[in-house]
Amino acid sequence: MMVLVRQIPEPEAPLLAKVFYGGGDPGPITATMAHVPELLEVALPFIGATLSPSALDWRTKEIVIVRTSALMQCRYCIDSHTPVALDSGLSSAQVHALRGEVDLATAFDNQRDLALVNWTDAVVGPGPVSDDSRLAAQVMFCEAEVVELTLLVGVTLLLNRYATSLALPVNDDVVARLASEGFSRS
């Protein structure tokens, strides 16, 4: 694929961006955002806060991230988060289902997980979220959870479009892990 935006290596990073490099390779999202350090320094803390540990557990967040990424067909995010989702406690069958490779009903039997997937699908989908979807979310999640889940979908959508538009490459270690776990590249 054509490289649209070069990843800035740490020695060449602008001063405002260097703090996000941690003395090494920060990954393609940070290394490309470094072209505009004044946006990097506001975007990454928000993205980090949304993706980091919170009242929502790691597994829940990975359900949202993988499902959103699959619906948006973001190869980079699906591939990068598949190992993370497995590490968060999701089974291989559940991750395959979130990726859209098998039926969700065969992999998930927990009503909260299914409600989470349905809320994610509703927020990602075109047009307004239906009253039925809102009611289903209200039954399963408290208000703070609905807010955080919705922001998580939104941040994931932003990253999906960013990674897809720039055709960001997936780390070689991730590609190897996908193969070792029996997952094909997206």
What are these regions (language model features)?
Residues 1-58, 115, 179-186:
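Mobile cap/lid helix-loop segments that border enzyme active or cofactor-binding sites
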Residues 38-40, 78-97:
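Iron-sulfur (Fe-S) cluster-binding segments and ferredoxin-like electron-carrier domains
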Residues 133, 143-184:
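Preference for long, well-ordered alpha-helical segments
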